[in-house]
Amino acid sequence: AAAAYIAETGRGWLESLTIVKEVFTEADQILPKSIPGSLFKGSLEVLKYLSQAGIKLGILSADNITAVQNFIKYYQLNDYIQIAMGVNDSPSKPDPKLFLQACQKLGVKPVRALMVGDSPTDIEMGRKAGAAGCIGIYWGKAEANYLQGADVAIANLEEIKVF
């Protein structure tokens, strides 16, 4: 989300992502993380719903695996998330290897998987990996132009339904 804000100032997405990574890396060295990032409103309920529907779920993050595992533990998502991967598991987004490795570990072909993400690099990763589709999530912001490569853009996870 921080990279999206920087990109809105006119910088390119990859430049914005690089700036954010550098800033957060420096901040992580100075300040200890006591609480992981926030869980968006309604996310827990949607994860429960999708898990109960038999959907295999994973978190693929540009953060390191320790931070991802701390996030899952803090928000008690272990019952819903089958795989968690961070950048120290694989090259970072938008490289498709992260998505492909997750699909392999889940026993799911990429053409049978969806990528749900809130950044252009999420969407690009899904496209490059051959995902069945890419859902961009803009978390209710006024504009979702930065997700233009997605098959569909949604305001929140609650818009995802299983039929």
Segments predicted by a language model, with ranges:
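A metal-dependent, Asp-based hydrolase signature
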Residues: 1-29, 49
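Short, acidic loop-to-helix structural element flanking the phosphoryl-transfer center
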Residues: 29-59, 65-69, 96, 111
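Surface-exposed amphipathic alpha-helices with a cationic face
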Residues: 44-52, 103, 123-128
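Conserved H-loop
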Residues: 78-82, 109
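Glycine/Thr-rich beta-alpha phosphate-binding loop at enzyme active sites
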Residues: 83-94
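Conserved Lys-Pro-Asp/Glu-containing loop-to-beta segment of HAD-superfamily phosphomonoesterases
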Residues: 93-123
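Acidic, Mg2+-coordinating phosphoryl-transfer loop and its flanking beta/alpha structural elements
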Residues: 115-154
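Short amphipathic alpha-helix with an adjacent loop that forms part of the alpha/beta core around
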Residues: 160-163
